Amino acid sequence: MSDKFQSIKGFYDILPADTALWQRIEDSARQVLSQYGYRNIRLPIVEPTELFIRGVGEHTDIVEKEMYSWEDKLNGDRLTLRPEGTAGCVRAVVEHSLTYNGPQRLWYMGPMFRHENVQKGRQRQFHQIGAEAFGYTGPDVDAEQISMLARLWRELGVANEVELQLNTIGDASERAQYRQVLIRYFEQHESLLDDDAKRRLYANPLRILDSKNPAMQTMIEAAPKLLDSLGEESRAHFDGVTRQLDQLGIKWTLNTRLVRGLDYYNRTVFEWVTNKLGSQGTIAGGGRYDSLVQSLGGKETPACGFGIGLERVFLLMRECGIEAFHSPDVYLVNVGDAANKAALPIAEALRDSGLSVSLHAGGGSFKSQMKKADQSGAQYALILGDDEIAANEVCLKPLRENGEQRRMSLSQAIEALHT
């Protein structure tokens, strides 16, 4: 038996070859969120289990089948690794009275955990960026959040590979009415329902609309539409969202089967999808949740938010041939005792000027060090030998373009590297 440990199924390492592209996604998201006035909030990954039962929904797949939960050995509390970010963010808003002085725009980033079947684009530990806006009643913030995501896709170079799907699921009373309509319809076609749909029939019939079972698609397509059960106020809200998206030139498709997998949503729901990732094509999704804050102990507070699946955005960018690389500006080659002693102070001087430097360590011939300099991806090699040290000079050699190796003072080299 091997003594070597391996990561747990569904929990994986993000290796240095991939982190440059991850950081590009994260940095672009931070920049866009800041442009829209969202502030960062950092939340724990462990929350009370009851938070998700009440917040996400007792009869959702997340709560019924996918959460990592346990009992605290010290006090018997039921705890859960967060399966999504909205409920925890709402808990923090309520606990710290963050909306006392007015509306809040918050964002967070980090790992989430669900015990799901592992496949491409679906892991048991996955990463999300989420944004939540509290205290905004009209359709403006719904449209603005969608616009914010459209801007992010442009920044990342994938705007032409994603499609916005949009729906409205009305308010609680309209959904309750529609729920009964759906139950009656599916009862008439119960022989066509699979086991999962039969389980959902009376607990959460709207989720049947989201089934991917090919044998049920014709029946689902013919099901009554929630739009037919909407009141005037919900229709006006949805019209306001779509009108603003049209004004912004953001294309959208009405998907009347889009309901999202969490019970807290009302009115606007949306997903950004791509056809490049197979069955895991949703890269972001969200909507409005006007009753969640109150249901988790706060005052009645309108809210809207979304989550971005970072693994799927990463995979989409790779599918599109988009890469990012971390390469130093300079690789510092040093050969000889005097050069070796001077190398670290010189590397620090280069870094003080704002340059990134990979300092060769561990000795080696000039030829082997130059080979490593080339492999590092650096634009330049800064070469130190005992002769250069004696003359108080360095050699600067371009690595990515034709150019002569030049001998100069360190200050001249720093100036040249910044031009």
UniProtKB/Swiss-Prot annotation:
Gene3D superfamilies: Anticodon-binding domain, Bira Bifunctional Protein, Domain 2. Transmembrane segments: none annotated. It catalyses: tRNA(His) + L-histidine + ATP = L-histidyl-tRNA(His) + AMP + diphosphate + H(+). GO terms for biological process: histidyl-tRNA aminoacylation. One of its GO terms (cellular component) is cytoplasm. The keyword Protein biosynthesis applies. One of its GO terms (molecular function) is histidine-tRNA ligase activity. It comes from the Bacteria. Keywords: Aminoacyl-tRNA synthetase, ATP-binding, Cytoplasm, Ligase, Nucleotide-binding, Protein biosynthesis. InterPro entries: aa-tRNA-synth_II, aa-tRNA-synth_II/BPL/LPL, Anticodon-bd, Anticodon-bd_dom_sf, His-tRNA-ligase, HisRS-like_core, HisRS/HisZ, HisRS_anticodon. Homodimer. Belongs to the class-II aminoacyl-tRNA synthetase family. This is Histidine--tRNA ligase. It comes from Methylobacillus flagellatus (strain ATCC 51484 / DSM 6875 / VKM B-1610 / KT). The gene is hisS.
